[in-house]
Amino acid sequence: MDIVKFESESSQGLHELLVNLRKEFVNLAFQKKLGQCNNFSRFSLIRKSIARSLTVLNRRKREGKNA
């Protein structure tokens, strides 16, 4: 997902997306431990999406306090 899509999402939507991404990351970690995971590139995509959503949320939080 592109950073522009994250910025267009509402804060509530970003929180929900963040929860879902973290759940998916945990599920992939379990699959990896069990040897069932075939798509290891998904780990980096999920980590980057989590970082992007946190970046947008923190930027909004900072701007809200300064404004």
Swiss-Prot record:
SUPFAM superfamilies found in the cross-reference section: Ribosomal protein L29 (L29p)
Keyword Hydrolase in record: no
Record's keyword annotation contains Ribosomal protein: yes
Biological processes annotated in GO: translation
GO cellular component, one term: ribonucleoprotein complex
One Pfam family of this chain: Ribosomal_L29
GO molecular function: structural constituent of ribosome
InterPro entries: Ribosomal_uL29 (IPR001854), Ribosomal_uL29_sf (IPR036049)
Keywords: Ribonucleoprotein, Ribosomal protein
Family recorded in the similarity comment: Belongs to the universal ribosomal protein uL29 family.
Alphabetized HAMAP family for the sequence: Ribosomal_uL29 (MF_00374)
NCBIfam families xrefs: L29 (TIGR00012)
Record-given protein name: Large ribosomal subunit protein uL29
Organism, as annotated: Wolbachia pipientis subsp. Culex pipiens (strain wPip)
Taxon lineage: Bacteria, Pseudomonadati, Pseudomonadota, Alphaproteobacteria, Rickettsiales
